[in-house]
Amino acid sequence: MKIYCCLNTVGFFMDGCGVIPPDSKEITAEHWQSLLKSQAEGGVIDFSVFPPSIKEVIRTHDDEVADANFQKQMLISDATDFINSRQWQGKAALGRLKEDELKQYNLWLDYLEALELVDTSSAPDIEWPTPPAVQAR
């Protein structure tokens, strides 16, 4: 199987798989696999040169903070979903929480509060709170 690269179309093409642009050039399967592996690890394929290479991606502090904010919101959402799945808030309002449920509810509320206090501006050096151990129902 031959693999081609087209700098104008910005893509890879394989022999026998559709139309190959006339300005394409052949690359080795090893080089193609190396590019795809590097791309999967976060690299960016640079089609401005032949053969294509991997551009070094330099993450900024703003990128790290954005990732941390996303992580924080996901953890808060997961914790809230877990609390809601146990119906602790409704049971508490009706005075129907058992002692062990009340302890777990408070642990999860403490965890949510700790998540809210996480300062994402220090990303990527964040010490995330640990969620409480989940007890079987």
Curated annotation (Swiss-Prot):
Family matches, as InterPro entries: Phage_T4_Gp38_tail_assem (IPR003458), TFA_Chaperone (IPR051220)
Family (UniProt): To E.coli YfdK.
Protein name (record): Uncharacterized protein YmfS
Highest classification ranks of the organism: Bacteria, Pseudomonadati, Pseudomonadota, Gammaproteobacteria, Enterobacterales
Gene responsible for this protein: ymfS
